[in-house]
Amino acid sequence: MPHSSLHPSIPCPRGHGAQKAALVLLSACLVTLWGLGEPPEHTLRYLVLHLASLQLGLLLNGVCSLAEELRHIHSRYRGSYWRTVRACLGCPLRRGALLLLSIYFYYSLPNAVGPPFTWMLALLGLSQALNILLGLKGLAPAEISAVCEKGNFNVAHGLAWSYYIGYLRLILPELQARIRTYNQHYNNLLRGAVSQRLYILLPLDCGVPDNLSMADPNIRFLDKLPQQTGDHAGIKDRVYSNSIYELLENGQRAGTCVLEYATPLQTLFAMSQYSQAGFSREDRLEQAKLFCRTLEDILADAPESQNNCRLIAYQEPADDSSFSLSQEVLRHLRQEEKEEVTVGSLKTSAVPSTSTMSQEPELLISGMEKPLPLRTDFS
């Protein structure tokens, strides 16, 4: 199954499975209609009638929605009736053209025995009214999720962009300089490429304690990087601080890195605790996964995040107490160290040997007393 590179449980964006299934359904229906042996005119007439009823049903549903939206025309649509109509009916010209075209074909085809068009129109209006009053026209949860993802309407989308714009975009460009300054004063404690990055923890259950040592005693606070300050949103000399942690293994230091949680996950957890937010545990898990995927996509295209930031997404097993956050972080650090060594060896092997290229050119002189002419075919 397709999933994000961060974690197997993080889904990839939806593809075109629904469209492919619709093509299969279309083929099956065409074969069924062909096998029934009905006259083509008869089949076409009922098909056009059905399409016309669908368009008319959508139109009637939009008219009912328009009655409510007109009450908010100034607050939601800046007093524009055209915007209000488009919000409820889509493009009125397109929908009206489809409706008129369907009605034209309905009356132009040979008539068959059936209920009058006026009776069918009244029945269609009745069914749409019942759908609205009884709440039968709601979308399925999967459809709502697909619409929100496609339109970037999710809570996770806004949180991920807020986290990047309001925090990561500001601190990542200066991170390497702050680490170099720290190393100058503390004997290169953060040496190596993997130690000179910001590692962001992404627990999918949104469990974000304020103290990392509470999550794992083998993660121990060591020091802080030099603070970064700046004026933002009217706040003078706003301070940005990052913490350095040492990772213990068998009681010994096994790694050192700049480590922290993604604070928006704490917001998601808090939202699920407030009934006013209408945010269930399942919603929290879905939004946490979408937050991780969106943040990964943002950082993949952000030049300031190149080699400056790494995401560590994980999910603690509910029935397994052997999970160790420090070991999870160490696993990522060691994996990156291996990748750094592999990339370095490939670059070294790609450079041609300089043992012969760097030598001084030598002038080779023949031992003959007289130089030979340019032509050697003389007799």
Swiss-Prot record:
3',3'-c-di-GMP binds at S162, Y167, R238, V239, Y240, S241, T263. It is a multi-pass membrane protein. Changing Q273A: Abolished translocation from the endoplasmic reticulum in response to cGAMP-binding. Reduced phosphorylation by TBK1. One of its GO terms (biological process) is reticulophagy. Changing K20R: Does not affect amount of ubiquitination. Residues 35-44, 107-116 are lumenal. The modification Phosphoserine is found at S241, S355, S358, S366. Changing E68A: Abolished ability to induce the production of type I interferon. Residues 341-370 are annotated as: Disordered. Changing I365A: Abolished ability to induce the production of type I interferon. Changing K137R: Does not affect amount of ubiquitination. Changing G166S: Slight decrease in c-di-GMP-binding. Residues 340-379 are annotated as: C-terminal tail (CTT). Changing T263A: Strong decrease in c-di-GMP-binding. Pfam families: STING_LBD, STING_TM. Changing Y240S: Strong decrease in c-di-GMP-binding. Changing R14A: Abolished ability to induce the production of type I interferon. There is a cross-link at K338 (Glycyl lysine isopeptide (Lys-Gly) (interchain with G-Cter in SUMO)). Ubiquitously expressed. Expressed in skin endothelial cells, alveolar type 2 pneumocytes, bronchial epithelium and alveolar macrophages. Changing G158 to S/V: Partially constitutively active mutant that promotes the production of type I interferon in absence of cGAMP ligand. In absence of cGAMP, the transmembrane and cytoplasmic regions interact to form an integrated, domain-swapped dimeric assembly. In absence of cyclic nucleotide (c-di-GMP or cGAMP), the protein is autoinhibited by an intramolecular interaction between the cyclic dinucleotide-binding domain (CBD) and the C-terminal tail (CTT). Following cGAMP-binding, the cyclic dinucleotide-binding domain (CBD) is closed, leading to a 180 degrees rotation of the CBD domain relative to the transmembrane domain. It is linked to STING-associated vasculopathy, infantile-onset: An autoinflammatory disease characterized by early-onset systemic inflammation and cutaneous vasculopathy, resulting in severe skin lesions. Violaceous, scaling lesions of fingers, toes, nose, cheeks and ears progress to acral necrosis in most of the patients. Some patients have severe interstitial lung disease. The cGAS-STING signaling pathway drives sterile inflammation leading to type I interferon immunopathology in severe COVID-19 disease caused by SARS-CoV-2 virus infection. Tissue damages in the lung and skin lesions are caused by activation of the cGAS-STING signaling leading to aberrant inflammation. Endothelial cell damage is also caused by activation of the cGAS-STING pathway: SARS-CoV-2 infection triggers mitochondrial DNA release into the cytosol. Facilitator of innate immune signaling that acts as a sensor of cytosolic DNA from bacteria and viruses and promotes the production of type I interferon (IFN-alpha and IFN-beta). Innate immune response is triggered in response to non-CpG double-stranded DNA from viruses and bacteria delivered to the cytoplasm. Acts by binding cyclic dinucleotides: recognizes and binds cyclic di-GMP (c-di-GMP), a second messenger produced by bacteria, cyclic UMP-AMP (2',3'-cUAMP), and cyclic GMP-AMP (cGAMP), a messenger produced by CGAS in response to DNA virus in the cytosol. This is Stimulator of interferon genes protein.
